[in-house]
Amino acid sequence: MKAFYGILIIFILISMLDLSQQVFINAKCRGSPQCLPKCKEAIGKAAGKCMNGKCKCYP
C-alpha cells in the first residue's frame, strides 16, 4: 500500500509540471478554425485551437 501512495505522489508532482510546448498568442477567436491561419503565421505550423476566446498554438 505504501508503494501505491508513493507512486500516486510522484504522479501528482509530475502532472503539475508544464511539459507541453503550447503557445498562447494574443489573437481573439470564436472557433478553432479561426486559429489555424493565425498559428501558421505566428509559429509556422497550423496546429492550434480556440480556448476562452484566445488562440492556443502547438508547435
UniProtKB/Swiss-Prot annotation:
Keywords: Disulfide bond, Ion channel impairing toxin, Neurotoxin, Potassium channel impairing toxin, Secreted, Signal, Toxin, Voltage-gated potassium channel impairing toxin
Keyword Signal: yes
Residues the UniProt record annotates as site (Basic residue of the functional dyad): K49
Keyword Secreted: yes
Record-annotated membrane-spanning stretches: none
Pfam families assigned to the protein according to its UniProt record, in alphabetical order: Toxin_2 (PF00451)
SUPFAM superfamilies to which the protein is assigned, alphabetical: Scorpion toxin-like
Endpoints of the signal sequence: 1-22
Gene Ontology terms for molecular function: ion channel inhibitor activity; potassium channel regulator activity; toxin activity
Gene3D superfamilies recorded: Knottin, scorpion toxin-like
Family to which this protein belongs: Belongs to the short scorpion toxin superfamily. Potassium channel inhibitor family. Alpha-KTx 04 subfamily.
Official protein name in the record: Putative potassium channel toxin Ts23
